[in-house]
């Protein structure tokens, strides 16, 4: 009998949601993760500074941890590379990394909802079997295997088939038969045959075994709740609304759930049953009761657990349907979200002030909300300082305390206050290393940069310990001297040295500092990375292709030496004055310039030229190969083969889209046609004229 029963239900026909609706949430989906102090809008990721731009779930978790006086449980950085070095994150990163979930929990996030508890249920079942002395050992092994086979029903597979390897006749003891009956009921449950599951669990709900008795009562209520929701869930597992729920079945589920809790107020499944009661409140549209329950959850229970995260996402998902009056944490999170820049329904100052009554027991949180409004909406930075006193010298910071002081630091920075450096330095003494310290270091670094003291970031014994912060400054702010020093600083990680050297050589080459390039290119190590396909997306945590300056591609038809030799030729001609636009360029210079253009093209340097990698000069001041070619075309001193190649290349700049991919001043199609006619006519015998059949 059991064999046919198992095969009958072994294929899971649909992913019915135990939680009742799809996870819409408010998780940020943008890939834009910028590590920055201010966070005014959803366009960026979240950080440990509670702010309007954070995912509302992150803010809710931070405030929950603050209420419980707990720091974030973060033994290490999450693996977010290349998204801003782990200091900012998506909500999904919080779930998988900050909470430090184990392998079982990671699987739990991606399991059909009614199968979520399978592994935990298996452990409970196996333990109950093992301690039941009335079951022979030989039968226990059969019962363990029977439970294990049920797991196939929760596997993702289009076609799953198996056979039950043991005959039911192998279980002869009374207690063993009771556990086998539980397995049969569970098979109906995992096979989504809800009425049959309820019937089978009911038959064993008065079992003499204490675990079967409790588990069966719990499973009756759980199955009834799922059955009541079936009519409100479409084929894709999307919840269609409470109105489509079977209210009669829902009432039965509520009676069963309350009966379980009455008999087991501190049972194995009490926490889960309380969660199901919240689901019943939702399905019955009892939002006042649900609001009260969520207020209790956010203030009194730890949301940084597996069950807590489920509750947190549930709270966030339903926030628009619930009253905001009770529970200052949830109200605060919603108010912060209404401060986001660009939102059409941004909260007004009058509306914010009208909420004061709800924060009578939490003045620090309310003044923090007022300070956020002053900073992000009103841009009244002095008001922020009035609302948040200086407490930078604390020995430690809970999430709200840290966020308050970080906001004060941002206001000081916005005012360019003389005290800002001292403030950030004081905060360093009390912050945690993993998440809080990088925020404070960023504030301090920003001040150094503003005061033209960027060397403070890189000097020996610097207060700035964070590698990512140093790399961002190498990429976007460091001058030639800092870049050269860091490229040779053996106390730094290889990634920092490679980045410093790459930016140094790139800037030298594209700004015409050829003599310096020849000298510094000797610093490129052997076998350095040359993979440059994603060079346009170069970020601090990218794998740096510094090897292109030593072992890059020099030529694909036009003969060119290494880029160091080419740069040496350009440096020599520059010293002779042949780079002066008013002087004729000699043949050596023309060839070197064409080879520089080929280096740009073959190593994807073109893709970088519009990036702003430093304050001086701007990208518009970089030397573009489009300009190389047009200048050489118009120079009568350039020999015919080089001029033909310049024509060939400048026309190809517009292939295939008609847009200029070479930089420099773009020309219209008529000009490109004239170039093509010139190449095909005057230089028609050249290799380059023969290879080009179109213009764009």
Predicted segments, located by residue:
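Bacterial N-terminal signal peptides
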Residues: 7-17
């Amino acid at each position: 009998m059991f064999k046919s029963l198992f095969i009958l239900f072994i294929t899971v026909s649909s992913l019915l949601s135990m939680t009742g609706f799809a996870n819409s949430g408010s998780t940020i989906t943008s890939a834009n993760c910028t590590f920055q102090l201010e966070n005014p809008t959803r366009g960026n990721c979240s950080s440990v500074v509670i702010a309007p731009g954070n995912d509302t779930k992150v803010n809710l978790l931070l405030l929950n941890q603050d209420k419980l006086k707990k720091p974030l449980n973060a033994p290490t950085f999450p693996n977010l590379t290349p998204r801003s070095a782990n200091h900012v994150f998506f909500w999904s990163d919080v779930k998988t990394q900050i909470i430090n979930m184990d392998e079982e929990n990671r699987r739990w996030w991606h399991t059909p909802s009614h199968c979520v508890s399978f592994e935990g249920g298996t452990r409970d079942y196996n333990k109950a079997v093992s301690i039941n002395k009335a079951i022979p050992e030989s039968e226990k092994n059969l019962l363990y295997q029977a439970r294990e086979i049920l797991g196939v029903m929760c596997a993702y597979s289009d076609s799953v088939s198996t056979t039950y390897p043991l005959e039911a006749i192998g279980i002869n003891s009374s207690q063993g038969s009771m556990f086998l009956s539980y397995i049969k009921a569970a098979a109906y449950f995992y096979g989504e045959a809800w009425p049959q599951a309820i019937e089978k669990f009911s038959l064993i709900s008065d079992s003499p075994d204490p675990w079967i008795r409790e588990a069966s009562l719990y499973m009756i209520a759980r199955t009834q709740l799922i059955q009541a929701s079936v009519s409100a869930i479409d084929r894709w597992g999307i919840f269609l609304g409470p109105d489509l729920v079977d209210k009669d079945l829902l009432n039965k589920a509520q009676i069963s759930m309350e009966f379980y809790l009455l008999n087991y107020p501190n049972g194995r499944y009490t926490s889960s049953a309380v969660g199901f009661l919240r689901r019943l409140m939702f399905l019955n549209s009892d939002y006042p009761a649900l609001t009260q329950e969520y207020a209790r959850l956010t203030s009194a229970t730890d949301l940084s657990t597996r069950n807590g995260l489920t509750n947190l996402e549930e709270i966030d998902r339903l926030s628009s349907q619930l009253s905001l009056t009770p529970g200052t944490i949830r109200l605060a999170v919603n108010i912060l979200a209404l401060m986001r820049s660009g939102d059409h329904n941004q909260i007004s100052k009058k509306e914010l002030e009208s909420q004061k009554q709800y924060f009578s027991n939490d003045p620090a949180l309310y003044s923090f909300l007022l300070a956020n409004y002053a900073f992000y909406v009103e841009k009244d930075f002095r008001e922020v300082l009035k609302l948040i006193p200086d407490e930078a010298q604390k020995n430690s910071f809970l999430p709200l305390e840290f966020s308050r002081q970080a906001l004060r630091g941002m206001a000081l920075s916005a005012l360019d206050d003389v005290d800002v450096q001292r403030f950030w330095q004081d905060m360093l003494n009390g912050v945690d290393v993993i998440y809080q310290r990088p925020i404070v270091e960023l504030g301090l670094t920003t001040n150094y940069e503003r005061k033209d003291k960027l060397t403070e970031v890189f000097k020996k014994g610097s207060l700035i310990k964070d590698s990512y912060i140093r790399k961002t400054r190498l990429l976007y702010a460091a001058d030639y001297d800092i870049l050269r020093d860091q490229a040779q600083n053996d106390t730094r990680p290889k990634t920092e040295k490679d980045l410093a050297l790459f930016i140094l050589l790139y800037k030298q080459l594209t700004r015409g500092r050829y003599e310096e390039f020849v000298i510094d290119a000797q610093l490129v190590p052997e076998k350095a990375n040359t993979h440059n396909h994603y060079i346009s997306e170069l970020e601090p945590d990218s794998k740096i292709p510094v090897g292109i300056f030593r072992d890059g591609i020099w030529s694909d038809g036009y003969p060119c030496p290494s880029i160091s030799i080419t740069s040496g030729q350009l440096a020599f001609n520059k010293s002779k004055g042949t780079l002066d636009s008013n002087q004729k360029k000699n043949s050596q210079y023309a060839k070197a310039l064409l080879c520089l253009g080929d280096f740009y093209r073959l190593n994807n340097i073109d893709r970088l030229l519009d990036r702003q990698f430093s304050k001086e000069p701007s990208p518009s001041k970089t030397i573009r190969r489009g300009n190389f070619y047009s200048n050489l075309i118009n120079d009568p001193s350039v020999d015919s083969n080089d001029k033909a190649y310049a024509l060939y290349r400048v026309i190809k700049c517009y292939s295939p889209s008609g847009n200029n991919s070479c930089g420099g001043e773009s020309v219209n199609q008529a000009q490109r046609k004239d170039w093509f006619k010139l190449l095909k006519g005057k230089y028609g015998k050249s290799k380059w004229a023969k290879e080009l059949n179109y213009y764009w």
